[in-house]
Amino acid sequence: MSQEPTTYSLFLFLFLSHGVSSYTVPNSRQDLHPLLQNMAEEIIDGSYLNALLDLIQFQSSHVWTDDLSHRVLAYLNSRNVAFTIPSLQAAVENHLEQRLHQPQKLLEDLRKTDAQQFRTAMKCLLEDKKDGLDLKDIIIDLGEIRERALQSPGVNRSLFLITLERCFQMLNSLECVEILGKVLRGSSGSFLQPDITERLPRDLREDAFKNLSAVFKDLYDKTSAHSQRALYSWMTGILQTSSNATDDSASWVSAEHLWVLGRYMVHLSFEEITKISPIEIGLFISYDNATKQLDMVYDITPELAQAFLERISSSNFNMRNTSTIHRQAHELWALEPFPKMLGLLVCFYNDLELLDATVAQVLLYQMIKCSHLRGFQAGVQKLKAELLDIAMENQTLNETLGSLSDAVVGLTYSQLESLSPEAVHGAISTLNQVSGWAKSQVIILSAKYLAHEKVLSFYNVSQMGALLAGVSTQAFCSMKRKDISQVLRSAVSQYVSDLSPAQQQGILSKMVQAEDTAPGIVEIQGAFFKEVSLFDLRRQPGFNSTVLKDKELGRSQALFLYELLLKTTRRPEELLSAGQLVKGVTCSHIDAMSTDFFLAHFQDFQNNFALLSPYQVNCLAWKYWEVSRLSMPPFLLAALPARYLASVPASQCVPFLISLGKSWLDSLVLDSHKKTSVLRKVQQCLDDSIADEYTVDIMGNLLCHLPAAIIDRGISPRAWATALHGLRDCPDLNPEQKAAVRLKLLGQYGLPQHWTAETTKDLGPFLVLFSGDELSSIATKFPEILLQAASKMARTLPTKEFLWAVFQSVRNSSDKIPSYDPMPGCHGVVAPSSDDIFKLAEANACWALEDLRCMEEDTFIRTVELLGAVQGFSRPQLMTLKEKAIQVWDMPSYWREHHIVSLGRIALALNESELEQLDLSSIDTVASLSWQTEWTPGQAESILQGYLDDSGYSIQDLKSFHLVGLGATLCAINITEIPLIKISEFRVVVARIGTLLCSTHVLAEFKRKAEVVFGDPTEWTSSVLQELGTIAAGLTKAELRMLDKDLMPYFQPSAIKCLPDEIFKELSAEQIASLGPENAAAVTHAQRRRLSPLQLQSLQQALDGAKTHSWQDAPASAGPTRTSSSRSPAGALQSWGLWLGCPLLVLMAKLLW
């Protein structure tokens, strides 16, 4: 892919710079230890890795004295090879850096090492301590070398392969297994391809085999299904060899074998499980760690689980033997030990006949872990429902509530509403730990719990756990501030992120009271801190970098705080090391940094790269280019204008690809044309092909941007398996890439109808690429695998064909029994069942209107929140579901808060008249509606007016949390009423209002209100502009023209999009050029059409990352001094052979003179 740069010129340069060593020692060969003589010969041959290994070996048994360095140099001098200590050090550094970028050559080097050198290399990998070699003149940090090697793309692969090839012949097998574990645990799992098992040793000592099996168990989830099967075969091949089984009727599977297999026991066949001796299975169950093993069989199938349960029941353990179960104590949970031993097998327990209520409760308690299963959740829910019925026999729900575990999430609204406040209060220690609550259930249970409490205090709120989101905004506002403060410092604070924006603002309004702001703000921790308004921050004098370390900052907060603290601190580096504060570093701050300071603290930016905006990255790139382009991390070149990519010589393609592959190109380069240029450079480096798996390792995230042509024809068979493993994780392949992947898969595996279960599992993320006809066979053969694949696509909306295949699969496997008492017009219609709806998730969008209309009322009640979360429902489907809600709950005027909250998107089907009927007196109800973003202006106005009418508030009465809760419906406000909003409430929620995409007229009125808070637009700072968000789109033409061009990058992209076309075109060319890459990418096509040629040129400059600040663009010289040249930088980095892209040098060396 690229040629290794020669080091002759480097050596010559260092030689001339430092001077040739003049040390001479008589009889140097006889006077030098044989290991050091060998090291010197390796240096002469250019085998620096071998030389380093000789040095490490020597140091392990000898003390390095002051004269040894000079003796080594004298020896080299006697061989007519002249080095100084600095030049030798640089040569070794350069060589090792090259090997990090050329891991195939590292593999070759390690193959050529002698036995002693190889053992030394392996021992270095084994060490955990941060050891080093102190050679008096030089300190070599071996710990850093090891860490960098294990983290470098491709190096891990070479270390893995060489360990398999040579280690087991030269070192103790336990040590080799430990090395394999280190290397594999730092990998993506792609090393473990099915054919790798052919290289695994089959004659391991028992302890080494068990340890290596443990490594494979730890990596199970990173391993493909085919590789899991291959590793299982390797493990069982060794286990069967050691088995005492004499014929086919006897099982080779012993208790210890099951323990060794661990998660791999799910690959045992049904027949093998049924042959396991009852004695062995009973012995296995009695092991102390058997439960841990069975708790992790996440991908076990019901059939295999039933087989294991049958063998366990045939052993001396008996689920019904309550005297055995009772053996530890007499309390309810003392019945737990045996069910606990079953691990995830309990999720498939089916011997329910004559089961008593106590054991049913124990089983329910153990079934909490069933959420970890891969699939089969509908069956789990069904089993929980059956156990729930048994657990409540001869008892009321009030009596059993605390002993039903997480099965309580299956209770209907009517069951929850029937609970007494006392029962909920008594069961709170169970209810507060349950996950999976629907929001409507939380509302009901919280109301019951709080009804038992006379005063809302820290103590009773701290008991609520997962039910905290059910506390109303008004209730939070009624609490004392000291109680709120304690809540935010307690364990229950982890649930604050589950609260609605209105609830969070209600809490914030208590913490930040006008008369005493400072203590409240400082006490707010974590992500909640970013909700603090810029206005309140400006009133707080007591911030420092230490106080801010545990707080998440919004960008407007960071901009303000960094500028504030920079004026008062004597150690600006503390601000950069504070993490979140880097969001507030502006281009002017970067420009003002001295060269030494910038280079010394660039690592702080790199450590927090995900927090930086594209504009900040652009500024960092320009700064680095100006002060130290020879050591510039190559990925930063992508932030500069596209022509700068020509600065990457062919010899530096590998570090360029590694550096760029560790970042996400979509967030680094926003302009499609520029991205094309970057990818053209990538293709040039690759020579339009991927030759082997090492190239895949080096590419990292760039794999997701491979052109379709390379995917189709440029990936070699050797590299394809590794590439496919990486492509699985690509979030958004384009249509051409998807088509190319599909063709490759068809070429390799054939049509889906011929696929095995393992193939289907491995290709799960790619099933969406196939047609409905192609998927039909998968839906028939492997319906559960198809469902699992669909569940993992929750972040994206799959194709209609894929969803239809999922739908058909579920419908074909469900009971097709029409209702005994159907609704009128529903005779012969198989209505949706709760199980079907639970399984289908987004594929529920495939229901016909007739199916939804014929849904039974109980089914609707149990699944309404699932249906309300489906993004793909059409307007007619939503209308049908709304009618179903009216049929079940009566007219909207009778609906309570939990009804409205549960509707989700179904509420969008309510017309204006129906919305006016709703009880909208609670801001929490309104907040649940405003969460939807598809309201028509008329609907939004009905919700807003409904809240004002039902609550009795007027516009001037609205508090900050009311404004936040109104959300998008606030855009429906009459502009004549905006001036009535109290400034004291508006100023603390500016950032929230600035997220709304309101009309230009509404934004303009909000902008006028913002002027009261922040002054005239000519006085606005970067932090104010960032805080305002879309409100800034309300600026007039004159105000926009008056803005300093240096403020342009601090508009939010959403504000740029909201600027009317006729106003946007009033920006000067200089202002447009200063927008920055992110804001330039937000410019709409309609806005672009109104621009002049000069403005369009400026826009392209902004998109490309051209310099608009401080220095002039496009310096041509590669030297570190500034230049005013504006020529093309092509070839500017041809002397970039010394680039060391890692934050720390591979060989950490420190000269001590």
From Swiss-Prot:
Q: Please give the InterPro entries that the UniProt record associates with this protein.
A: Stereocilin-rel (IPR026664)
Residue positions bearing lipid (GPI-anchor amidated alanine): 1130
Q: Which residues form the signal peptide?
A: 1-22
Give a GO cellular-component term: side of membrane
Record's keyword annotation contains Signal: yes
Report the sequence similarity comment from the record: Belongs to the stereocilin family.
Bilayer topology term: Lipid-anchor; GPI-anchor
Where is region (Disordered) located? Answer: 1109-1128
Going by the UniProt record, its keywords in alphabetical order are:
Cell membrane, Deafness, Extracellular matrix, Glycoprotein, GPI-anchor, Hearing, Lipoprotein, Membrane, Non-syndromic deafness, Secreted, Signal
**Where do the record's glycosylation annotations fall on this chain?**
156, 211, 244, 289, 321, 394, 398, 460, 544, 812, 911, 974
GO annotation (BP), single: transmission of nerve impulse
Residues making up the propeptide: 1131-1153
Question: Gene name on record?
Answer: OTOA
Residues forming coiled coils: none
Which species is this UniProt entry from?
Answer: Homo sapiens
- Report the protein name in the record: Otoancorin
Q: What does this protein do?
A: May act as an adhesion molecule.
Q: Which PANTHER family match?
A: OTOANCORIN (PTHR23412:SF18), STEREOCILIN RELATED (PTHR23412)
